[in-house]
Amino acid sequence: MVTKGILLDLLKDIDPYLKEKVYLIAVGGTALTLLDIKHSTLDMDFNLPREKDSRAIRRLFTELGFEKINESKWISPNNLVIDLYDRDYIFCVQLIEDSIHNSKLIQEYRHITLKTLNLYDIIITKLARLENKDIDDIIEIFKKCEIDPKKLFQRYRETMKISLVAHPKENIMELFQLLESKNIVKTNELIEEIKKWNP
């Protein structure tokens, strides 16, 4: 398991070897670990918002002896698994224009600026897959943070216009019904609105 300390130590260790400034946007469980919503994550997931970030990080990983499984997946010398997502795509979700701008600053090193996606976009990227671990993570976000379900649905709907998600309506319906059944948040009115939505 990868804790917040392990995440930050890795970035602190590799930062001196970079020759230019780069942005890393933590996503998924990595972001939730950095935000202290989860204790740990199985691997590290980062978005590289600019082409120069992508080039610099992949070149650095190669120089430092990281094992390249494919263009997206790398393994560090101490066996940490790192997944990289380029530009505005994460999994099958294309982030809307203000997503990177609205990301949260976590740490600034000499070369690396580390941020996390905002909570709404973290939920949206997890809704795209909606595996059991994603459901657990989303419920944890709702329990620990103030999330406006209406704002979430509006942003989700905008994101789905430009994304390639198989069952967008069914996924958010399942989530909102679960949140309602667990008395975590009231979503009945939104569920009726979702029923009328044609993505």
Q: Which residues does each predicted region cover?
A:
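Compositionally biased terminal segments of proteins
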Residues: 1-199
